[in-house]
Every structure is written in structure tokens, then in C-alpha cells.
Amino acid sequence: MNTREVFNSHLPRNPNHIFTSAPHRIFVSPENISKERIILLGELLKKVRLVLRLKPKDTLSVFDGTGFEYRAQIVSLTPHAGELKIMGKTHPPRESPLEIHLGQAMPKSQKMDFIIQKAVELGVGEIHPFFSSRTIPRFNLSQAMKKIERWQKISQEASQQSGRINIPTVNPVVEFVELLALPSQASLKIILQKDSSHGSLKNFLTTNQNKRGIFFLVGPEGGFAPEEITRALDHGFKPISLGERILRTETVALTFLSILQYELGDMT
């Protein structure tokens, strides 16, 4: 029996838990992963050496953001590069069966950071920030690019922390009309409204038990303007209310995501 067989013979059979025994989990880009080796460079190398203070023979759980996870042992660490030996590879079924896209109006302050982090933890598939007519923060293209870089990093870190194997994409900020024009494969398109005269969430869940692709929109602090609601309805979005109480914009997305995952997804 070779080393790989010895290692694999002692792994738990449940693929959800194969690599959770490793004390540290990191993301490594697929281009730095070969059949038998993983290479660490730059900031990630610095983190492993100086922050985590790991040494040769220590083991790590590594994910590549494309659905694969690895158990790896450190072979060498220098100030310039690190090398890990792959001891096992798996494709654990940790992603939600739902393909959820969140269209989130730009909120004030740093609330978008929080929304992205928690939405990723709750299993969102993709995030689409947008400007609405009542959006308060506005920024230029240069500022927008910096924000997207930070938000994508937040998505990566939230995936790493929560055990996800994919990293949700945070798309560039667009105007509301541009968002509505985006092609979508979602079988359900929802615009969340505080007006309880719109469709109820309970009825929505009852009549859509078998739907898997969902695209939902959350407005800014002041809510959607009437003309925006009309535009969304013209593009096939259905209005749904979360009840009588008024929720903050950063609460709405997380509430709806939690309910979707519990009722239709994998939150058991």
C-alpha cells in the first residue's frame, strides 16, 4: 500500500467532513495547483508563514473556488515560495441546491461589506450591486473598481470561513435599468416590498417548492421608487412582502436568504 492509499484509508467516508479535521483552511487559485503540488506565493505565503506560523509537515485544508477541496501537507516554506504536497482531493457537496442571485441596492456606509459577507455564508450564488433612484452613496469608476476588489475579497474570505467550495462573484455596480436588462436563467424573479398588499411569502413558498433558480431584488434605505417597481414588474419580477414590520436594507436580504435555504434549500 502506497502513501496515498494509507492516507485515504484513514479518511472519513462522509465527503462533507473529509478535510474538516485540518485546523486551517485557505484558498489557493487553481493555477497554483497541479496534480500533486500546491504552490504558495505573495500574501498567502506570508499569511501561512508569519500569521498562522505553520511549519513543514503541518497539514492544511485547501479549496480552489471551483468546487474542489484538498488536504495538503507543507513540504517547504521560504520567504519566496511555499510548496505543499496534495494528500487527497474531493468534491464535497456543500453548495446549496438553489442558484440564488441577489440584486442589492447600494446602502449607506459600509453596510454592503456586511451584506456580502453574510449572504455568502448563507449560500448566495452571485451578487449584483446596483444604484437606484433613492440610493444615497454614489462614486466614480475608479472608486467602484476598488470597491469591487474589496467585495470580492470579502466573498472569498466568507467562503473560506464558512466551508464553501465555490466563491460567489460580486459583479460591477450598475444602474437599476441595466440590472433589469441583464440576461437571467432564473425561474423565479422577485422584488421584495414592504407593502403587504403584494404577494405573501408563505404563498410564494407553497407554490414554488420545485424551483431552483431565484433572482431577488432588495431596495435601498428609502425603498424602491414606484416607477422602479413598475419597471421590475415589466421585466417579469413578482412583488413579495416579508410582512408588516419595516426591515433595514441589510436585514432584508439575509432574512429572505435564510428562509429560502430553510424551506427550499439545504438548511435543515
Indicate residue ranges for each PLM-predicted region.
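N-terminal positively charged helical leader segments and presequences
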Residues: 1-91
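RNA substrate-binding interface of SAM-dependent RNA methyltransferases
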Residues: 2, 87, 93-190
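Fold-independent oxyanion-binding glycine-rich loops
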Residues: 30-31, 42-43, 65, 106, ...
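Glycine/charged-rich beta-loop-alpha catalytic/anionic-binding loops adjacent to active sites
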Residues: 38-40, 97-101, 212-215, 233-242
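Active-site/ligand-binding-proximal alpha/beta "capping" segment
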Residues: 186-223, 227-229, 237-240
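Structured adenosyl-cofactor binding patch, chiefly the S-adenosyl-L-methionine
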Residues: 226-268
